[in-house]
Amino acid sequence: PSAYSQIFSVLLQYLYDRFYPQVFDISRFATDALDFASAIHAKGQLIENCIGFIDGTFRHCCRPEDDQKVIYSGYYKGHGFKFQSVVCPNGLLCDFGGPHCGRRADSHMFRASGLEERMRQLSQKVGKILCVYGDPAYCRGEFVSKGYIGACTAAQARWTELMNALRETVEWGFMLV
């Protein structure tokens, strides 16, 4: 069985290395980016430059014989790998990253994925700073927006509620993967 696993792993790595740039490249959506931002703005109001929704997911796996600590997640209480994706308003996964060690936080996946640099390049192509909307696990930054937490006004709470409802589409995308 381990020979099959190794062959499968090598094949997956080859496919990932060979086709990732063509399949999951957010810059392919440069022509649609402003349309995406307009569609999200029409639904969520306050934000005019959001082109998609980002989230991470955890997929359980069998406990490995070696290096168990690397993929163990205390939060999920099990071993597994994490993946990150960005879903655009048209329902397509426009960026996908992983696998990452199960113990890593979503904000680490964002930094490790190189998505920030791709967002910077896309923003330069479009001529406007664009962002993705994420859950509270992501750090707010130039290219990541997230909802208000803690004490906030009624308008801010309503906006967060609207955007979180829209953000559910990224979780539906994980069901396809």
Q: Where in this protein do the model-derived segments appear?
A:
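Short, well-ordered secondary-structure "scaffold" segments embedded in the functional core
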Residues: 1-177
